[in-house]
UniProtKB/Swiss-Prot annotation:
<dbReference type="InterPro" id="IPR023042">
    <property type="entry name" value="Peptidase_M17_leu_NH2_pept"/>
</dbReference>
<feature type="compositionally biased region" description="Gly residues">
    <location>
        <begin position="132"/>
        <end position="150"/>
    </location>
</feature>
<feature type="active site">
    <location>
        <position position="479"/>
    </location>
</feature>
<feature type="active site">
    <location>
        <position position="402"/>
    </location>
</feature>
<feature type="site" description="Essential for hexamer stabilization">
    <location>
        <position position="386"/>
    </location>
</feature>
<dbReference type="GO" id="GO:0005737">
    <property type="term" value="C:cytoplasm"/>
</dbReference>
<feature type="binding site">
    <location>
        <position position="415"/>
    </location>
    <ligand>
        <name>Zn(2+) 2</name>
    </ligand>
</feature>
<keyword id="KW-0031">Aminopeptidase</keyword>
<keyword id="KW-0645">Protease</keyword>
<feature type="binding site">
    <location>
        <position position="475"/>
    </location>
    <ligand>
        <name>a peptide</name>
    </ligand>
</feature>
<protein>
    <recommendedName>
        <fullName>Leucine aminopeptidase</fullName>
        <ecNumber>3.4.11.1</ecNumber>
        <ecNumber>3.4.13.-</ecNumber>
    </recommendedName>
</protein>
<feature type="binding site">
    <location>
        <position position="390"/>
    </location>
    <ligand>
        <name>Zn(2+) 2</name>
    </ligand>
</feature>
<feature type="binding site">
    <location>
        <position position="402"/>
    </location>
    <ligand>
        <name>a peptide</name>
    </ligand>
</feature>
<feature type="binding site">
    <location>
        <position position="395"/>
    </location>
    <ligand>
        <name>Zn(2+) 2</name>
    </ligand>
</feature>
<feature type="binding site">
    <location>
        <position position="390"/>
    </location>
    <ligand>
        <name>a peptide</name>
    </ligand>
</feature>
<keyword id="KW-0862">Zinc</keyword>
<comment type="function">
    <text>Aminopeptidase which preferentially cleaves leucine residues from the N-terminus of peptides. Also, has some activity towards tryptophan and methionine and has very low activity towards alanine, arginine, asparagine, phenylalanine and tyrosine. No activity towards histidine, serine, valine, isoleucine, glycine, aspartic acid and glutamic acid. In addition, cleaves the Cys-Gly dipeptide, probably as part of the glutathione regulation pathway; cleavage only occurs in the presence of Mn(2+).</text>
</comment>
Amino acid sequence: MPLLRSSQHIKNTYWNIPKKSFRTGVPQFAESKKTRILHLHPLCKSASGVESPPFFDSQTFSSISNRKEFRKMATTVPQVVSLDPTTIPIDYHTPIDDLSIEVKDISAEACPADEGLIVFLLNSAPKHSSSGGSGGNGGSAGSSGNGEGGAQIKINSSVKDNTINEFLKEGNMENFTGKLGTSKSFYIANDQKKYVSLAYVGCGPANEETELEIRKVAYALVTLLHDSKHKKVSIIFEIKIEEALFRFFLEHLFYEYVTDERFKSADKSTETDFIKNLSLHIANADAYKGQIDKARVYFYGTYYAAQLIAAPSNYCNPVSLSNAAVELAQKVNLECKILDVKELEELKMGAYLSVGKGSMYPNKFIHLTYKGAQTGASQNEKKKIALIGKGITFDSGGYNLKAAPGSMIDLMKFDMSGCAAVLGCAYCIGTIKPDNVEVHFLSAVCENMVSKNSYRPGDIITASNGKTIEVGNTDAEGRLTLADALVYAEKLGVDYIVDIATLTGAMLYSLGTSYAGVFGNNDQLINKILSSSKTSNEPVWWLPIINEYRSSLNSKYADLNNISSSVKASSVVASLFLKEFIENTPWAHIDIAGVSWNFKARKPKGFGVRLLTEFVLNDAV
């Protein structure tokens, strides 16, 4: 019996999924769109107040016109034994789908205090001051307490309850300083003698809120939400916050609130009381209402990417990942093309194909396309963009095995984070549907394994642009797959090429776990990415491509080596290598090796989805 087989008797292959999930009983392929497909909440209103129907309920899928064509693009996942997984379980329905959100002007309407949880977001008081304001959102009740440095924290807002307003006036801030990420909870009776939960969440000093601080605030708030189990929650913003940061706050609040339990044997989600109503009380509310829909879309895109990254490699392999991309394309009406090994051979993608030779799973090249409507006077106004994500579903290092301490081989399922970010962006763009932009979502997906067929150190391989590469290290595989993907992208005739990849561990030492690094050959393009970084609140830092180091990639026998012979700046060297496969197109490379994974929480961040989406939208009209 051959070791590698595709059993015809397995009933849970990708296109024959049972109606019930193996873990939760959530309907899979044959159920209604309402529970299967990502969508905007039916009650979600736009800035104009017009209710929007669920996105997918109003769409027709013309790119993949029928089930037969859909099946044709997908591939049966190879198995060694019949119990091997054949699909990536993805939760397309989350508690956020059922969450009704309202944004209310705190200066015009006080927060009700009849039931549920009321949370005050508070800045710490200024140091060395006897009194201070927290944001000036207006109101009648006042409260003071000891802040940092002996100063006072003051609440300016009121609620629709005299008893609670009196409680707020009394202070009750002992041991609460407003320090970032801290909280204090109360359980008190209101005028109707019903008990109401109150909480303070510290946001740190005023005017210092950034992406990093908002993450901590959201995490502290989520802890309160899970502990309280209230279905109705009101959040009173006693802080000033920019619109983009407000949106990011919601995105991260949603992301932290949803728990990934796909691989648990019991369905714990049914035992949880999820919130159903969320009221956001903030000054100048009209300016923030338009951010709600966008926050939902960005959350879904990020959570979708995170699910792919978190899926272990026996579930997420090149075939199952490409199948997931096909399904996504159908759902958001994208054109879809999956290139198999034969087609890749015809394109002479020798660098990419070499990396996957040791795996039981064949290479799969994902190409999804979004074509926005042309609304301008000239067709030339339509920007064409290629986004490339590194898609190594597991990186053992190959014959240069990740065996050294700190090599984190157990985490190498995350080496397809770039691909996940691109697919998450594809969801967002397919949902928002911007005009005057065409986007190609690309990923050269494979697995870097050790076997008798694996490529070896010292091999000389030929990329699709004809350049020969000496393999100095099989663990520098990502740049080989990206090389052929860059050549493919440039042939599409796009205006910009942006690749995103967990490429070099050196990013952990240069920028740590908070900032991604961006390299490129075009200052204007990099500035666009930096601008998108600010509006998406996904931090990126511009790093140089130092041409002086190019000679360290020289090979005695080939055109170049895939690693440097002398230079230790491996992130810069990797960028120099990629640059060899770009001719004239403006190109940027984003290295997310340090920021993709949340090491403390032991889960992915989904980094890059918002950044890439903002980048695309900034070029759309």
